[in-house]
Swiss-Prot record:
Homohexamer with DnaQ-like exonuclease fold in a ring-shaped structure with a central cavity. Component of AGO1 and AGO10-centered RNA-induced silencing complexes (RISC). Interacts with and acts as a cofactor of AGO1 and AGO10. Its main location: cytoplasm. Residues 35-66, 102-127, 166-173 are annotated as: Oligomerization. 3'-to-5' exoribonuclease (RNase) specifically targeting single-stranded RNAs. Triggers miRNA accumulation in RNA-induced silencing complex (RISC), composed of miRNAs and AGO proteins, by degrading uridylated cleavage fragments. Required during plant growth and development. One of its GO terms (biological process) is positive regulation of miRNA metabolic process. It catalyses: Exonucleolytic cleavage in the 3'- to 5'-direction to yield nucleoside 5'-phosphates. It comes from Arabidopsis thaliana (Mouse-ear cress). It is found in: Cytoplasm. Belongs to the RICE family. Keywords: Cytoplasm, Hydrolase, Nuclease, RNA-mediated gene silencing. This is Protein RISC-INTERACTING CLEARING 3'-5' EXORIBONUCLEASE 1.
């Protein structure tokens, strides 16, 4: 069984999010961690996994090349951060299969361009995805909500104390890897809770 043995972080409602950050190499088996994320999404009832992707951008002559360099998956209790190799290895087939799952919905903020880049640049197809901003705008009857980022959207819907996230982000360049992991966990947890709130 996969162990999320990274740092754990307390959220503003006193719940706990356990993390795991992995530098994926050709011999790394990520499938147990993906299974744990999937299992937690099912046990928490809404079958959603919050995801975020991070890109390396390289300019070649007059155009930019985008390469997926890391991905984050969050559920109610876990945050998994995968730093991906360049070039991709065969063991990332598990990641492709995970994204193609029809049993869960991958939820994200401002993900339309990411979905297109994943497909165009890496052949990754997400079968079931949800742009949380669009759902929030429709549910609240406030079109502008669709264009908010993670922090602003979560604040608008949940009204949670954002001081810890703000503190980390205000000093991002000096932030430790542990602080950055905490920010990733907080953001994933916030969007999970926004989705949960909008479904009620």
């Amino acid at each position: 069984m996969a162990s999320f043995d990274g740092q754990g972080f307390m959220m503003v409602d006193n719940s706990w999010v356990q993390t795991k950050a992995i530098d994926v190499e050709s011999t790394t088996d990520i499938s147990p961690y993906l299974s744990k994320i999937l299992e937690d999404s099912v046990w928490n009832g809404n079958r959603s996994i919050v995801f975020d992707v991070y890109w390396d951008v390289k300019s070649v002559s007059t155009k930019s090349e985008w390469r997926l360099c890391s991905v984050k998956f969050s559920t109610k209790n876990f945050c998994l951060f995968l730093r991906l190799p360049n070039p991709f290895c065969d063991n990332l087939k598990d990641l492709y299969r995970f994204f193609a799952s029809k049993f869960v919905t991958f939820v994200g903020v401002q993900i339309q361009e990411d979905l297109a880049l994943l497909k165009e640049n890496h052949g990754i197809v997400i079968r079931s995805s949800l742009e949380i901003g669009k759902l929030a705008a429709k549910a609240r009857g406030t079109p502008i909500v669709e264009f908010l980022g993670t922090r602003e959207l979560a604040h608008k819907i949940l009204w949670y104390d954002m001081s810890r996230l703000d503190s980390i982000q205000s000093k991002w360049d000096e932030a430790s890897s542990n602080d950055r992991l905490e920010a990733a966990a907080i953001e994933g947890w916030l969007i999970f809770n926004v989705y949960d709130q909008l479904q009620q």
